[in-house]
Amino acid sequence: MALTIDELKIQIQSDEHRQLELKKTTGELKDGMHSACAFLNTEGGWLIFGVAPKSLKIQGQQVTDNTQREIAQALSYMEPQVDVRVEYIDIPDRPDHKVIAMHFDGWAWGMVPYTYHGCPYYKVESTTKEMPRDMYEERLRRS
């Protein structure tokens, strides 16, 4: 499910929504992981770093070994563990910058709800919220 730069441009045309979260850089990695957890507990979606949320401008960022380690470390705090492919998309007019994209599959009844650092999240429209305890416990009972 590799995303090209042209597909990315189409994807972000409609601004952030229930299945799309944009972050300017991985400096917002923790907030991004809250959204990733919420995607896993709702309908799934894309988490994209390197796109300004307000202007929708594709800026990208420099990606180092340290950047990749930070992403891997952040993903390791997800419970249960997730196997997500992290895509690094080249930006034609900025050769030293990449957009970082991750797709998370949605939740289905019977699955254990996901947590990030022990806290479950879910999506309400384009907003990421902590999952209410009763909703979390109901999902645990049905898993």
What is the predicted function of each stretch?
Residues M1-S143:
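Conserved N-terminal catalytic/coupling substructures associated with nucleotide/phosphate chemistry
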